[in-house]
């Protein structure tokens, strides 16, 4: 007799983070996988410590819903910068130092009252840039190389920026941002920070009524040429390339927007319904799109080595958004309106896992970095004492802290945010 195949039990989340009182719209794992940042439909931001699963900072960043949120650490991991995009038509940059964390509010939105909100201490608002937020398309950002960054001895910033920046001579991290154009919802604007200046506009396609821009992604080629992938309301996806490397002249006030010559290098009607999200894996020369229809499509990026072919799969499950490719390019995940998170193979597009826990639709997912080399000293949690090396056999608090950090950093986290306001953390693949 043949032995019946034993079915593996369904996957279950490792942790559930409960803190938001409204749907989760943005997630990002950063700080060497030690921090998770989340944003919700009421404009609240929470920075979570993934070691202790507790909030590090909580504040209301926008009066409207959060469209996207990103977090980064600088200055030997002692300074955190948070980039938020809200439905109040603002793109904000927030900053706090490791020594400020004890002073920041930690009361979660589900527990907060209006009185506590008025007395709350929030991070420094470094920049507030007016941008379009009418069509639910979140920003995409790209840090510039040092040789591309203009000299901003006197950066153009708001008065609020100059009075609230923590520390003396805070570092200026030059970056580009792509957002939909304010006048033509099918066009794309490129902004520069810290100059807070619009550099150019990629006009809407004149031959096709694509409708609104639904998603954008900025990325570099191997030769450091700037590319942007975009997805549209009618199901089209496109890729534009800016030929030649960027120079400081391109960011100076003397350069006009006409000096930015964009070339459309790829266009495809990939979906029958609005394309909801895209993500690019430059090292592999491809990007993935998901839509309100049931298709998941893998597209080649012309100019990235050998040009591949378009691959698509009918998943039988409509409404998958928030697509994210993991840093090693092996798997990607989508957030489903049916409350499921699905994990696919980047190579074959085969469905590898269906993660079911949430009772309501999921809107966003985030992967941990599985390829980075991490320094798990105490400085990663804002305490420099843990960076010291203990002798063999010596037991100390620093050793325990370092071991905890290493365990979290090496975990293949997948975070999912749902309409129910909860964040599920999964350890997969």
UniProtKB/Swiss-Prot annotation:
> SUPFAM superfamilies per the record?
WD40 repeat-like (SSF50978)
Which InterPro entries does the entry link to? WD40/YVTN_repeat-like_dom_sf, WD40_repeat_CS, WD40_repeat_dom_sf, WD40_rpt
Example GO CC term: the record gives: nucleus
The protein's name: ASTRA-associated protein 1
Subunit and interaction comment: Component of the ASTRA chromatin remodeling machinery complex.
Instruction: Return the annotated region ranges for Disordered.
Output: 148-176
What are its GO biological-process terms?
chromatin organization
* WD repeat segments: 19-58, 64-104, 208-250, 270-314, 315-354, 392-429
Described purpose of this protein according to its UniProt entry: Component of the ASTRA complex involved in chromatin remodeling.
Q: Which family does it belong to?
A: Belongs to the WD repeat ASA1 family.
Name where it's found: Nucleus
Pfam families of this UniProt entry?
A: WD40
Where would you say this protein principally sits, based on its record?
Answer: nucleus
Q: Print the keywords alphabetically.
A: Chromatin regulator, Nucleus, Repeat, WD repeat
Q: Give the highest taxon in the source lineage.
A: Eukaryota
Q: Which organism is it from?
A: Aspergillus flavus (strain ATCC 200026 / FGSC A1120 / IAM 13836 / NRRL 3357 / JCM 12722 / SRRC 167)
Q: Which PROSITE patterns match?
A: WD_REPEATS_1, WD_REPEATS_2, WD_REPEATS_REGION
């Amino acid at each position: 007799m043949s032995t019946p195949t034993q079915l593996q039990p369904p996957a279950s989340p490792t942790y559930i983070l409960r803190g938001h009182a409204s749907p989760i719209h943005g997630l990002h794992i950063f700080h060497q996988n030690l921090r998770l940042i989340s944003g919700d439909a009421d404009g609240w931001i929470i920075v979570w410590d993934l070691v202790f699963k507790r909030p590090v900072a909580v504040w209301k960043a926008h009066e409207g819903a959060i469209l996207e949120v990103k977090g980064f650490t600088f200055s030997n991991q002692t300074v955190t910068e948070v980039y938020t995009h809200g439905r109040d038509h603002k793109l904000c940059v927030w900053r706090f130092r490791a020594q400020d964390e004890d002073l920041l509010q930690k009361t979660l939105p589900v527990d907060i009252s209006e009185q506590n909100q008025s007395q709350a201490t929030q991070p420094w608002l470094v920049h507030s840039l007016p941008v379009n937020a009418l069509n639910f398309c979140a920003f995409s950002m790209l840090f510039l190389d040092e040789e591309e960054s203009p000299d901003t001895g006197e950066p153009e910033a708001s008065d609020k920026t100059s009075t609230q920046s923590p520390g003396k001579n805070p570092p200026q991290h030059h970056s580009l941002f792509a957002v939909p154009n304010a006048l033509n919802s099918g066009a794309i604007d490129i902004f520069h920070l810290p100059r807070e200046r619009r550099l150019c506009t990629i006009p809407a396609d004149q031959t096709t009524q694509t409708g609104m821009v639904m998603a954008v992604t900025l990325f570099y080629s191997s030769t450091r040429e700037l590319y942007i992938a975009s997805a549209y309301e009618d199901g089209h996806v496109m890729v534009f390339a800016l030929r030649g490397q960027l120079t400081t002249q391109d960011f100076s006030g003397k350069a006009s927007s006409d000096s930015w010559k964009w070339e459309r290098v790829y266009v495809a009607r990939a979906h029958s319904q609005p394309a909801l999200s895209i993500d690019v894996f430059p090292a592999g020369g491809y990007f993935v799109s998901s839509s309100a229809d049931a298709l998941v499509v893998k597209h080649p990026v012309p100019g990235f080595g050998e040009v591949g072919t378009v691959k698509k799969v009918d998943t039988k499950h409509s409404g998958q958004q928030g697509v994210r490719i993991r840093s090693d390019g092996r798997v990607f995940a989508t957030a489903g309106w049916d409350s499921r998170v699905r994990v696919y193979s980047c190579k074959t597009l085969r469905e590898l896992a269906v993660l079911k826990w949430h009772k309501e639709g999921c809107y966003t997912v985030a992967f941990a970095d599985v390829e980075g080399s991490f320094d798990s000293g105490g400085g990663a949690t804002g305490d420099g004492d843990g960076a010291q090396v203990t002798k063999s056999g010596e037991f100390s608090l620093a050793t325990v802290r370092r071991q905890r950090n290493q365990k979290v950093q090496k975990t293949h986290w997948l975070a999912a945010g749902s309409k129910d306001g909860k964040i599920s953390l999964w350890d997969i693949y």
